Amino acid sequence: MSALHTLSLAAIRDALARREVRAEDAVLDCLARIETTEPRIDALLHLRAEAAIEEARALDAAGPDASRPLWGVPVTVKDALTTAGTPTTAGSRILEDFVPFYDAFAVQRLREAGAIILGKNNMDEFAMGSSTENSAYKPTRNPWDTARVPGGSSGGSAASVAAGQCFASLGTDTGGSIRQPASLCGCVGLKPTYGRVSRFGLIAYGSSLDQIGPMTRTVEDAAIVMGVIAGHDKRDSTCADRPVEDFAAALASRHDLAGVRIGVPAEFWGEGLSPEVATSCRAALDAARDLGATIVDVALPHTPQSIAAYYIVASAEASSNLARYDGVRYGKRAHAPEDLMDLYVRSRSEGLGDEVQRRIMLGTYVLSSGYYDAYYRKAAQVRRRILEDYRNAFATCDVICGPVSPVTAWPLGALTADPLQMYLMDVFTLSLNLAGLPGLSLPVGLGTESGMPVGIQLLGRSFDEATLLSVGNVLSRALPPLGSPAGLR
């Protein structure tokens, strides 16, 4: 069987289980694909080639195990998740020497399920960015056009999946960082409900916003990975102790969209939305209607305020989370400091990038005496209103649908000098994180002008990923496939 990297995760899993393919063959095929594509897209920071081959050989020697749903499947992981024995930098110079001795919960679950981790993906530093240009090491490029961004902050994961370097990747989503790069790179991305997946081992950005989720080439593949990584973990006090649904069974139970009410918020379809994105997303809604869905209007009136609220809340949490990286106990230490204050200042100034420093300063400011009520408390109040908006909307619909990004992937460097414009790229994704609800991004076509992927997002009720996945699976199967990335042909 040739070109294994073109298969879906479900297909390679089944081939491995039937011993039509060896785990070593799957790993070697992905490594060959990495060798071919990596110089053009820079999606990886760390590669575990030799270790992955050894792990594959050990699996082959033991034979397939039906109790391990990802047996022999090569995957990658965003570099914000700790991996025992493999560097974990979060895309930052301040952590370039950090090699953890433990796995993140989600990584542990992957290994227990039989997955083989090929490497760690590039990302915006500490997940702060929308283009993966804020990585301290290198920018990642979009496989569909290597002169354009892949999105962020999980841009390395999205690029790896789209390029066929792996069959799935784990990303993180604090304000759209799974859904937006998935949209820009033409793959599927699932942001679970807050608390569905343990954050143990995740290098934190915004602790009340961060979630870990799968990035894959099909909705079915996302359901498979989601079934592996979801579950309670006592090491994360915010992780929900509740049963995990059989997501694969949920997909199998739905064959059309009859009876499904899809809410369309006007706030997602107004000013700033490019015509080519609007055209592709409306065509997807038409397809949903043809499949039996009922399209209803809903309102999310506080969407315009979500950007300000998000950057206040997220920056405040980041300033607290990143305070530990001072060169004393955590983080790379500046060379030959003159005194303790010089150690603090130089370690953080040399180790942290401009965008991270900008958000730390903003977060420290909004939490400072005299400004807390004016900024942070108001942002928290807006956050509550946003959750109420979603609850009111779900009283009349089952899922909410809208564009993921207002535009398709933009040229590298086009927005780096304008942070505010970069922040606006997340206008449709931020509110979901503030509400803690699940969202699924799936590709719906190529832009009529740019020729780049366009994604649509389905937003759901708390802990109702099963509905999102089943609806998304039916819809995605009715849409024409994107084909292989044009930038790598």
From Swiss-Prot:
Its EC number is 6.3.5.7. One of its GO terms (biological process) is translation. It comes from Nitratidesulfovibrio vulgaris (strain DP4) (Desulfovibrio vulgaris). One of its GO terms (molecular function) is ATP binding. It is an enzyme of class 6 (ligase). Keywords: ATP-binding, Ligase, Nucleotide-binding, Protein biosynthesis. This is Glutamyl-tRNA(Gln) amidotransferase subunit A. PROSITE patterns: AMIDASES (PS00571). Belongs to the amidase family. GatA subfamily. The active site is at 78 (charge relay system), 153 (charge relay system), 177 (acyl-ester intermediate).
